[in-house]
């Protein structure tokens, strides 16, 4: 009788462990990679944009140090560039060519890697193009001193 109870108890524990094993992998499968989270942020940027063309990821800065919790907001920094695809086409931006002399924006903010929540807090600012002539003028132009130190004996 005692062995039947022990066997029944062991069977229940085995069932619980099996169920737990099925649940844990599905939870970890819902975490996005850093790049996937940024690509979703770019998609959200395109959805909310009022500009004529889609933007596509141009450059992604290094991901932050590993953090085990996918629900913790991660800092991101990336650059997007305007493509030739009009926004209403709803074509994936990855399939669009970059527009020659298209706008470039630097984006910073935070993303969460949890697929369910997928929170994004991103701000993008257009980068100013600098002509080489302007840059050379700034470098060669003599700088006026802002202050002078005079030593008196």
Curated annotation (Swiss-Prot):
Which GO molecular function, any one, fits this protein according to its record? lipopolysaccharide binding
Q: Which UniProt keywords apply?
A: Antibiotic, Antimicrobial, Disulfide bond, Pyrrolidone carboxylic acid, Secreted, Signal
> Which residues lie within the region annotated Disordered?
61-80
| Pfam families associated with the record | Cathelicidins
Q: Where does it localize?
A: Secreted
Q: Which residues carry this modification: Pyrrolidone carboxylic acid?
A: 30
Signal peptide segment: 1-29
Superkingdom of origin? Eukaryota
Q: Which Cys pairs does UniProt list as disulfide-bonded? A: 85-96, 107-124
According to UniProt, the name of this protein is Antibacterial peptide PMAP-23
Q: Which organism is it from?
A: Sus scrofa (Pig)
């Amino acid at each position: 009788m005692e062995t039947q109870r022990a066997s029944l108890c062991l069977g229940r524990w085995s069932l619980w462990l099996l169920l737990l094993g099925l649940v844990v992998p599905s939870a970890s499968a819902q975490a996005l990679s850093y790049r996937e989270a940024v690509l979703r942020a770019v998609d959200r940027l395109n959805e909310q944009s009022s500009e004529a063309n889609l933007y596509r990821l141009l450059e992604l800065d290094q991901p932050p140090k590993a953090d085990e919790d996918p629900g913790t907001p991660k800092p991101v920094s990336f650059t997007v560039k305007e493509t030739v695809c009009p926004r209403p086409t709803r074509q994936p931006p990855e399939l669009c060519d970059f527009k020659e002399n298209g706008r470039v924006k630097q984006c910073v903010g935070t993303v969460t890697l949890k697929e369910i929540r997928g929170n994004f807090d991103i701000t993008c600012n257009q980068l100013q193009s600098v002509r080489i002539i302007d840059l050379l003028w700034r470098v060669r132009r003599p700088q006026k001193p802002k202050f002078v130190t005079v030593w008196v004996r």
